[in-house]
Amino acid sequence: MTTLRATMTAIAIAGKGGPEVLRPETIAVPQPGPGQLLVKVAAAGVNRPDVMQRLGLYPAPKGHSEIPGLEIAGTVVASGEGTRRFMTGHTVMALVNGGGYAEYCVADETACLPIPTGRGMVEAAAIPEGFFTVWHNVFERGGLKQGEWFLMHGGTSGIGVVAIQLARAFGAKVIATVGSADKCTACLELGATRAIDYTSEDFVEAVKAETKGRGVNVILDIVGGDYVERNIRSLAEDGRLVNIAFQKGSKVTIDLMRVMLKRLTLTGSTLRIRPAEVKAGIARAVEDKALPLVGNGQVKIIVDSAFPLSEAAKAHERMDESHIGKIVLRV
């Protein structure tokens, strides 16, 4: 196995802190192990876990790259033993365990997907993290079904814009919460039945009114904190609450009696630390059931902005501003 170069530029985290701690460094090009591909990165998605890692709150799993970046798109340039599907020269998009903010990145072949026809590298890099996360949490853990009500907090986030569209595509009725009127408009354009501006409306009361008092069946929550108890109040009987982040805190107090009386399911997950075989299963489901909707235009890839790799700090600054959709680094 050979690589194009011995060294590459990558964005390192030079200590805990603000975006300014993201700095270009020259490091060795990684080598693919068994079942892995070496990808020449053309674009890398920027996600909230990258920000959490920069702040020292979400360290890289043991044995994986400390370079941030959980999704990439690019061209295969080398492969390890046992790879079967993708070969040198193939273009792929991939969910990775880290290392995406770099010129080259190693990816498990089973977590790689073909890029949908007609999609460029920037769009492709905006797909894996959101689609894997939404499919696993909304449809597998949350069990969202046709005709059910789905509530998405953070409707214009990178996760939110995917969740709204996929839920609607599979026949659910969608409610989204956001923090401004223009974001409400964006959610409605993506297919939400109702958009709630949480700065001026109580989402619990709005959900109750929209569902005629029944509540929603599935909630995907990235907020945590005091939203958890309010989510429980917003769920219908046999409802499912799925937490994937906790921007307002992970320690909460809930009324278990309400959970018991309504027979609720409270669950959640993190994707980065899951075994490769779990991610492989999610990848196949995404490829079989979700990506065709991208190919036929039913689900759009929403990219807010793209920055050069050298401006990763500016991309993180953009994460803290009012944006709609994904932020991507061009490599």
Locations of regions flagged by a protein language model:
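C-terminal hydrophobic helical "lid"/dimerization subdomain
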Residues: T2-A6, K279-V331
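Glycine-rich beta-strand-centered segment in the early N-terminal region that forms part
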Residues: A28-G45, L57-G99
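NAD(P)H dinucleotide-binding glycine-rich loop of Rossmann-like/cofactor-binding domains
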Residues: M52, I67, R85, T91-T156
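Mid-domain Rossmann-like dinucleotide-binding core that forms the NAD(H)/NADP(H) cofactor-binding site
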Residues: M87, A125-E201
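Short glycine-centered segments of the SAM/dcSAM-binding site in methyltransferase folds
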Residues: T91, W149, K173, G239-R240, ...
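Short, glycine/polar-rich helix-capping loops at beta-to-alpha or helix-loop-helix junctions
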Residues: G100-E103, V178-A186, F203, K251-L256
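Glycine-rich phosphate-binding loop and adjacent beta-alpha segment
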Residues: V178, D226-Q298, V331
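Short amphipathic alpha-helix with an adjacent loop that forms part of the alpha/beta core around
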Residues: F203-G213
